[in-house]
Protein backbone atom coordinates (compact mmCIF):
# COMPACT_ATOMS: atom_id res chain seq x y z
CA UNK A 1 0.00 0.00 0.00
CA UNK A 2 1.35 3.43 -0.94
CA UNK A 3 1.93 6.05 1.73
CA UNK A 4 -1.13 8.32 2.18
CA UNK A 5 1.31 11.22 2.27
CA UNK A 6 2.24 10.50 -1.33
CA UNK A 7 -1.12 9.32 -2.71
CA UNK A 8 -3.86 11.49 -1.16
CA UNK A 9 -4.63 14.37 -3.60
CA UNK A 10 -4.60 17.07 -0.90
CA UNK A 11 -1.89 15.74 1.43
CA UNK A 12 0.27 15.12 -1.65
CA UNK A 13 0.39 18.88 -2.33
CA UNK A 14 1.43 19.60 1.27
CA UNK A 15 3.99 16.79 1.07
CA UNK A 16 5.59 18.21 -2.07
CA UNK A 17 5.67 21.70 -0.54
CA UNK A 18 6.80 21.12 3.05
CA UNK A 19 7.95 17.53 3.61
CA UNK A 20 9.60 15.81 0.66
CA UNK A 21 10.57 19.08 -1.02
CA UNK A 22 14.18 18.83 -2.30
CA UNK A 23 16.03 21.75 -0.70
CA UNK A 24 19.64 22.94 -1.12
CA UNK A 25 21.75 21.59 1.74
CA UNK A 26 23.58 24.86 2.35
CA UNK A 27 20.84 27.48 2.82
CA UNK A 28 21.53 29.71 5.83
CA UNK A 29 19.29 31.33 8.45
CA UNK A 30 18.52 34.07 5.88
CA UNK A 31 16.18 31.52 4.28
CA UNK A 32 14.11 31.31 7.49
CA UNK A 33 12.23 34.54 6.83
CA UNK A 34 9.81 33.02 4.31
CA UNK A 35 8.38 30.64 6.89
CA UNK A 36 8.47 33.38 9.56
CA UNK A 37 6.40 35.61 7.27
CA UNK A 38 3.92 32.76 6.86
CA UNK A 39 3.62 32.41 10.64
CA UNK A 40 3.24 36.20 10.98
CA UNK A 41 0.45 36.21 8.39
CA UNK A 42 -1.38 33.40 10.20
CA UNK A 43 -0.94 35.20 13.54
CA UNK A 44 -2.25 38.48 12.07
CA UNK A 45 -5.30 36.78 10.54
CA UNK A 46 -6.15 34.97 13.81
CA UNK A 47 -5.67 38.00 16.10
CA UNK A 48 -7.42 40.23 13.54
CA UNK A 49 -10.40 37.91 13.42
CA UNK A 50 -10.79 38.06 17.21
CA UNK A 51 -10.42 41.86 17.16
CA UNK A 52 -13.09 42.13 14.43
CA UNK A 53 -15.52 40.28 16.73
CA UNK A 54 -15.46 43.25 19.13
CA UNK A 55 -14.60 46.20 16.88
CA UNK A 56 -17.20 48.57 15.42
CA UNK A 57 -16.38 50.40 12.17
CA UNK A 58 -18.19 53.63 12.99
CA UNK A 59 -16.62 57.05 13.62
CA UNK A 60 -18.56 57.57 16.85
CA UNK A 61 -17.71 54.20 18.43
CA UNK A 62 -14.48 52.93 16.76
CA UNK A 63 -12.11 54.52 19.30
CA UNK A 64 -14.15 53.42 22.32
CA UNK A 65 -14.56 49.89 20.88
CA UNK A 66 -10.75 49.54 20.82
CA UNK A 67 -10.64 50.84 24.42
CA UNK A 68 -13.36 48.30 25.29
CA UNK A 69 -11.26 45.48 23.74
CA UNK A 70 -8.26 46.49 25.87
CA UNK A 71 -10.19 46.95 29.13
CA UNK A 72 -13.14 44.56 29.13
CA UNK A 73 -12.53 41.68 26.72
CA UNK A 74 -10.72 38.65 28.15
CA UNK A 75 -7.08 39.00 27.07
CA UNK A 76 -8.24 41.72 24.67
CA UNK A 77 -5.15 43.81 25.47
CA UNK A 78 -2.98 40.82 24.51
CA UNK A 79 -4.82 40.27 21.21
CA UNK A 80 -4.72 43.97 20.35
CA UNK A 81 -0.99 44.39 21.09
CA UNK A 82 -0.13 41.07 19.43
CA UNK A 83 -1.87 42.39 16.29
CA UNK A 84 -0.21 45.82 16.42
CA UNK A 85 3.30 44.56 17.19
CA UNK A 86 2.81 41.52 14.94
CA UNK A 87 2.56 44.02 12.06
CA UNK A 88 5.94 45.46 13.05
CA UNK A 89 7.49 41.99 13.13
CA UNK A 90 5.88 41.28 9.75
CA UNK A 91 7.63 44.30 8.20
CA UNK A 92 10.98 43.57 9.86
CA UNK A 93 10.89 40.09 8.33
CA UNK A 94 9.66 41.44 4.97
CA UNK A 95 12.62 43.83 4.74
CA UNK A 96 15.08 41.09 5.78
CA UNK A 97 13.49 38.74 3.22
CA UNK A 98 13.84 41.33 0.43
CA UNK A 99 17.40 42.16 1.54
CA UNK A 100 18.28 38.46 1.39
CA UNK A 101 16.80 38.31 -2.12
CA UNK A 102 18.95 41.24 -3.25
CA UNK A 103 22.15 39.98 -1.60
CA UNK A 104 21.96 36.44 -2.96
CA UNK A 105 20.45 37.33 -6.36
CA UNK A 106 17.15 35.54 -5.71
CA UNK A 107 15.45 38.18 -7.89
CA UNK A 108 16.58 36.18 -10.92
CA UNK A 109 13.52 34.00 -10.30
CA UNK A 110 11.47 36.63 -12.13
CA UNK A 111 7.92 35.39 -11.47
CA UNK A 112 8.57 34.67 -7.79
CA UNK A 113 10.24 38.07 -7.33
CA UNK A 114 7.54 40.10 -9.09
CA UNK A 115 4.75 38.37 -7.15
CA UNK A 116 6.79 39.14 -4.02
CA UNK A 117 6.82 42.85 -4.93
CA UNK A 118 3.04 42.76 -5.49
CA UNK A 119 2.75 41.07 -2.07
CA UNK A 120 4.78 43.90 -0.54
CA UNK A 121 2.35 46.46 -2.01
CA UNK A 122 -0.65 44.48 -0.71
CA UNK A 123 0.84 44.18 2.79
CA UNK A 124 1.64 47.91 2.82
CA UNK A 125 -1.92 48.76 1.77
CA UNK A 126 -3.34 46.44 4.44
CA UNK A 127 -1.11 47.90 7.17
CA UNK A 128 -2.02 51.47 6.18
CA UNK A 129 -5.75 50.74 6.31
CA UNK A 130 -5.38 48.88 9.60
CA UNK A 131 -3.67 51.91 11.13
CA UNK A 132 -6.75 54.02 10.32
CA UNK A 133 -9.19 51.70 12.15
CA UNK A 134 -8.57 52.70 15.82
CA UNK A 135 -9.66 56.22 14.76
CA UNK A 136 -7.09 58.05 16.85
CA UNK A 137 -5.53 61.38 15.86
CA UNK A 138 -2.71 59.81 13.83
CA UNK A 139 -5.17 57.36 12.23
CA UNK A 140 -7.37 60.19 10.97
CA UNK A 141 -4.62 62.55 9.84
CA UNK A 142 -2.53 59.75 8.36
CA UNK A 143 -5.54 58.69 6.28
CA UNK A 144 -6.17 62.31 5.25
CA UNK A 145 -2.57 62.99 4.20
CA UNK A 146 -1.91 59.70 2.38
CA UNK A 147 -5.23 59.53 0.50
CA UNK A 148 -4.78 63.20 -0.44
CA UNK A 149 -1.59 62.27 -2.32
CA UNK A 150 -3.76 60.79 -5.07
CA UNK A 151 -5.06 64.30 -5.82
CA UNK A 152 -1.66 64.91 -7.45
CA UNK A 153 -2.66 62.59 -10.32
CA UNK A 154 -3.45 64.91 -13.26
CA UNK A 155 -7.05 65.38 -14.37
CA UNK A 156 -8.71 62.54 -12.37
CA UNK A 157 -6.89 63.16 -9.04
CA UNK A 158 -9.40 65.25 -7.02
CA UNK A 159 -12.37 63.13 -8.18
CA UNK A 160 -10.45 59.95 -7.32
CA UNK A 161 -9.75 61.17 -3.77
CA UNK A 162 -13.42 62.00 -3.13
CA UNK A 163 -14.37 58.63 -4.58
CA UNK A 164 -12.01 56.84 -2.16
CA UNK A 165 -13.25 58.97 0.76
CA UNK A 166 -16.90 58.38 -0.12
CA UNK A 167 -17.53 62.06 0.59
CA UNK A 168 -15.72 65.39 0.87
CA UNK A 169 -13.44 64.37 3.74
CA UNK A 170 -12.24 61.30 5.63
CA UNK A 171 -15.41 60.27 7.47
CA UNK A 172 -17.71 57.36 8.35
CA UNK A 173 -17.82 56.02 4.76
CA UNK A 174 -13.99 56.00 4.62
CA UNK A 175 -13.67 54.13 7.92
CA UNK A 176 -16.27 51.52 6.92
CA UNK A 177 -14.66 50.77 3.56
CA UNK A 178 -11.16 50.69 5.08
CA UNK A 179 -12.39 48.09 7.57
CA UNK A 180 -13.91 46.03 4.73
CA UNK A 181 -10.67 46.15 2.72
CA UNK A 182 -8.51 45.54 5.79
CA UNK A 183 -10.54 42.40 6.47
CA UNK A 184 -10.47 40.99 2.92
CA UNK A 185 -6.89 41.84 1.87
CA UNK A 186 -5.08 39.33 4.16
CA UNK A 187 -7.01 36.52 2.46
CA UNK A 188 -6.00 37.87 -0.96
CA UNK A 189 -2.42 38.03 0.38
CA UNK A 190 -2.70 34.37 1.47
CA UNK A 191 -3.78 33.39 -2.06
CA UNK A 192 -0.86 35.39 -3.52
CA UNK A 193 1.53 33.67 -1.09
CA UNK A 194 0.40 30.31 -2.50
CA UNK A 195 1.14 31.54 -6.03
CA UNK A 196 4.49 32.91 -4.77
CA UNK A 197 5.34 29.41 -3.45
CA UNK A 198 4.02 27.72 -6.60
CA UNK A 199 6.47 29.69 -8.75
CA UNK A 200 9.29 29.18 -6.24
CA UNK A 201 8.81 25.41 -6.33
CA UNK A 202 8.94 25.46 -10.14
CA UNK A 203 12.61 26.47 -9.92
CA UNK A 204 13.58 25.31 -6.42
CA UNK A 205 15.25 27.51 -3.81
CA UNK A 206 18.32 29.60 -4.46
CA UNK A 207 21.30 29.14 -2.10
CA UNK A 208 24.09 31.38 -0.69
CA UNK A 209 26.61 30.45 -3.40
CA UNK A 210 24.17 31.31 -6.20
CA UNK A 211 25.24 28.11 -7.99
CA UNK A 212 22.97 25.30 -9.19
CA UNK A 213 22.36 22.95 -6.26
CA UNK A 214 20.54 20.09 -8.04
CA UNK A 215 23.42 17.75 -7.24
CA UNK A 216 23.15 18.38 -3.49
CA UNK A 217 19.58 18.44 -2.22
CA UNK A 218 18.10 17.20 1.06
CA UNK A 219 14.42 16.70 2.04
CA UNK A 220 12.72 19.65 3.73
CA UNK A 221 11.48 17.59 6.69
CA UNK A 222 13.00 16.99 9.19
CA UNK A 223 16.02 19.23 8.48
CA UNK A 224 14.43 22.55 7.60
CA UNK A 225 11.21 21.99 9.55
CA UNK A 226 13.30 21.89 12.74
CA UNK A 227 15.30 24.91 11.58
CA UNK A 228 12.08 26.83 10.86
CA UNK A 229 10.60 25.89 14.25
CA UNK A 230 13.71 27.37 15.92
CA UNK A 231 13.15 30.59 13.96
CA UNK A 232 9.48 30.67 14.95
CA UNK A 233 10.35 30.18 18.64
CA UNK A 234 12.87 33.03 18.53
CA UNK A 235 10.28 35.22 16.79
CA UNK A 236 7.61 34.43 19.40
CA UNK A 237 10.10 35.16 22.19
CA UNK A 238 10.89 38.57 20.67
CA UNK A 239 7.24 39.36 19.94
CA UNK A 240 6.06 38.34 23.43
CA UNK A 241 8.85 40.39 25.03
CA UNK A 242 7.70 43.39 23.01
CA UNK A 243 4.00 42.86 23.83
CA UNK A 244 4.48 42.22 27.54
CA UNK A 245 7.23 44.73 28.38
CA UNK A 246 6.81 47.71 26.03
CA UNK A 247 3.74 47.28 23.82
CA UNK A 248 3.67 50.96 22.82
CA UNK A 249 7.37 51.22 21.97
CA UNK A 250 6.72 51.36 18.21
CA UNK A 251 3.38 53.19 18.33
CA UNK A 252 2.55 56.90 18.35
CA UNK A 253 1.22 58.53 21.55
CA UNK A 254 -1.03 60.76 19.37
CA UNK A 255 -3.10 57.71 18.52
CA UNK A 256 -4.32 57.56 22.12
CA UNK A 257 -6.29 60.77 21.46
CA UNK A 258 -9.60 60.29 19.60
CA UNK A 259 -9.66 61.63 16.02
CA UNK A 260 -10.41 65.34 15.86
CA UNK A 261 -10.78 66.90 12.37
CA UNK A 262 -10.43 70.41 13.90
CA UNK A 263 -7.04 69.80 15.51
CA UNK A 264 -3.98 68.81 13.47
CA UNK A 265 -1.18 66.97 15.35
CA UNK A 266 2.16 68.88 15.30
CA UNK A 267 3.96 66.12 13.39
CA UNK A 268 1.99 63.81 11.12
CA UNK A 269 3.97 60.63 10.51
CA UNK A 270 3.13 57.02 9.62
CA UNK A 271 4.21 53.88 11.48
CA UNK A 272 8.00 53.31 11.58
CA UNK A 273 7.98 50.78 8.72
CA UNK A 274 6.76 53.41 6.22
CA UNK A 275 9.09 56.21 7.35
CA UNK A 276 11.77 55.57 4.68
CA UNK A 277 9.17 55.96 1.90
CA UNK A 278 7.62 58.96 3.69
CA UNK A 279 11.05 60.64 3.83
CA UNK A 280 11.48 60.12 0.06
CA UNK A 281 7.98 61.58 -0.50
CA UNK A 282 8.76 64.66 1.62
CA UNK A 283 12.20 65.26 0.11
CA UNK A 284 10.67 66.47 -3.18
CA UNK A 285 9.02 69.93 -3.01
CA UNK A 286 6.61 69.14 -5.87
CA UNK A 287 3.47 67.14 -4.96
CA UNK A 288 3.28 64.96 -8.09
CA UNK A 289 7.07 64.49 -8.09
CA UNK A 290 6.92 63.32 -4.47
CA UNK A 291 4.13 60.84 -5.19
CA UNK A 292 6.03 59.44 -8.19
CA UNK A 293 9.23 59.13 -6.12
CA UNK A 294 7.24 57.37 -3.38
CA UNK A 295 5.76 54.86 -5.84
CA UNK A 296 9.07 54.33 -7.63
CA UNK A 297 10.97 53.79 -4.35
CA UNK A 298 9.11 50.46 -4.06
CA UNK A 299 8.54 49.73 -7.78
CA UNK A 300 12.33 49.97 -8.28
CA UNK A 301 12.49 46.45 -6.81
CA UNK A 302 10.95 45.18 -10.05
CA UNK A 303 13.98 46.51 -11.96
CA UNK A 304 16.53 44.42 -10.05
CA UNK A 305 16.52 41.48 -12.52
CA UNK A 306 17.11 43.95 -15.39
CA UNK A 307 19.84 45.84 -13.50
CA UNK A 308 21.74 42.61 -12.70
CA UNK A 309 24.97 42.99 -14.68
CA UNK A 310 27.22 40.55 -12.84
CA UNK A 311 28.26 37.20 -14.26
CA UNK A 312 27.75 35.78 -10.76
CA UNK A 313 24.31 35.47 -9.24
CA UNK A 314 25.09 35.95 -5.56
CA UNK A 315 27.06 38.75 -3.86
CA UNK A 316 28.87 36.16 -1.73
CA UNK A 317 32.09 36.49 -3.75
CA UNK A 318 31.67 40.17 -4.71
CA UNK A 319 33.06 42.32 -1.85
CA UNK A 320 32.61 45.69 -3.62
CA UNK A 321 28.93 44.99 -4.33
CA UNK A 322 28.54 43.83 -0.72
CA UNK A 323 29.88 47.18 0.50
CA UNK A 324 27.41 49.00 -1.74
CA UNK A 325 24.51 46.96 -0.45
CA UNK A 326 25.41 47.72 3.16
CA UNK A 327 25.71 51.42 2.26
CA UNK A 328 22.19 51.12 0.83
CA UNK A 329 21.00 49.56 4.12
CA UNK A 330 22.61 52.41 6.10
CA UNK A 331 20.97 54.86 3.71
CA UNK A 332 17.54 53.30 4.35
CA UNK A 333 18.11 53.56 8.11
CA UNK A 334 18.95 57.28 7.66
CA UNK A 335 15.76 57.73 5.59
CA UNK A 336 13.73 55.99 8.32
CA UNK A 337 15.19 58.37 10.92
CA UNK A 338 14.53 61.44 8.73
CA UNK A 339 10.93 60.36 8.08
CA UNK A 340 10.22 60.70 11.80
CA UNK A 341 11.83 64.16 12.14
CA UNK A 342 10.09 67.54 11.69
CA UNK A 343 10.39 69.28 8.31
CA UNK A 344 13.15 71.78 9.12
CA UNK A 345 16.87 72.37 8.53
CA UNK A 346 19.08 70.22 8.57
CA UNK A 347 16.63 67.29 8.22
CA UNK A 348 15.28 68.49 4.85
CA UNK A 349 18.78 68.51 3.30
CA UNK A 350 19.75 65.16 4.84
CA UNK A 351 16.50 63.65 3.52
CA UNK A 352 17.13 64.98 0.02
CA UNK A 353 20.71 63.67 -0.02
CA UNK A 354 19.60 60.25 1.27
CA UNK A 355 16.77 60.06 -1.30
CA UNK A 356 19.15 60.88 -4.17
CA UNK A 357 21.68 58.31 -2.86
CA UNK A 358 18.94 55.66 -2.61
CA UNK A 359 18.10 55.88 -6.32
CA UNK A 360 21.73 56.43 -7.41
CA UNK A 361 23.03 53.36 -5.57
CA UNK A 362 20.39 51.08 -7.08
CA UNK A 363 20.18 52.52 -10.61
CA UNK A 364 23.79 53.57 -11.27
CA UNK A 365 26.36 52.37 -8.73
CA UNK A 366 25.29 48.72 -8.34
CA UNK A 367 25.19 47.89 -12.10
CA UNK A 368 28.50 49.72 -12.79
CA UNK A 369 30.17 47.99 -9.83
CA UNK A 370 28.99 44.62 -11.19
CA UNK A 371 30.49 45.42 -14.61
CA UNK A 372 33.75 46.50 -12.95
CA UNK A 373 33.91 43.24 -10.98
CA UNK A 374 33.36 41.28 -14.20
CA UNK A 375 36.31 43.15 -15.74
CA UNK A 376 38.52 42.49 -12.70
CA UNK A 377 37.75 38.77 -12.95
CA UNK A 378 38.44 38.89 -16.74
CA UNK A 379 34.87 37.71 -17.46
Curated annotation (Swiss-Prot):
GO cellular component term, pick one: respiratory chain complex III
Secretion signal span: none
Required cofactor(s): heme b
Binding site for a ubiquinone: 201
TM segment ranges: 33-53, 77-98, 113-133, 178-198, 226-246, 288-308, 320-340, 347-367
Subcellular location: Mitochondrion inner membrane
Residues at which heme b b562 binds: 83, 182
Binding site for heme b b566: 97, 196
The protein's assembly and partners: The cytochrome bc1 complex contains 11 subunits: 3 respiratory subunits (MT-CYB, CYC1 and UQCRFS1), 2 core proteins (UQCRC1 and UQCRC2) and 6 low-molecular weight proteins (UQCRH/QCR6, UQCRB/QCR7, UQCRQ/QCR8, UQCR10/QCR9, UQCR11/QCR10 and a cleavage product of UQCRFS1). This cytochrome bc1 complex then forms a dimer.
PANTHER family in alphabetical order: CYTOCHROME B
Function: Component of the ubiquinol-cytochrome c reductase complex (complex III or cytochrome b-c1 complex) that is part of the mitochondrial respiratory chain. The b-c1 complex mediates electron transfer from ubiquinol to cytochrome c. Contributes to the generation of a proton gradient across the mitochondrial membrane that is then used for ATP synthesis.
Family: Belongs to the cytochrome b family.
Misc remark: Heme 1 (or BL or b562) is low-potential and absorbs at about 562 nm, and heme 2 (or BH or b566) is high-potential and absorbs at about 566 nm.
Protein known as: Cytochrome b
Record organism: Trinomys eliasi (Elias' Atlantic spiny-rat)
Amino acid sequence: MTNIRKSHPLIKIINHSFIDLPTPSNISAWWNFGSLLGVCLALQIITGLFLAMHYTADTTTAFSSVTHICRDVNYGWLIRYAHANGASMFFIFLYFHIGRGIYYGSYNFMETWNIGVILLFLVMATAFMGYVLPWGQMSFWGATVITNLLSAIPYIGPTLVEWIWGGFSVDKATLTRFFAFHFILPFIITAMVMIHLLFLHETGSNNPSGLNSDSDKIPFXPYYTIKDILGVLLMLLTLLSLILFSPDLLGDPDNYSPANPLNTPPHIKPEWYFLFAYAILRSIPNKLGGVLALAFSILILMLFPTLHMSKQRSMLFRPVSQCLLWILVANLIILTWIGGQPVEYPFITIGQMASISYFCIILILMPTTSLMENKLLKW
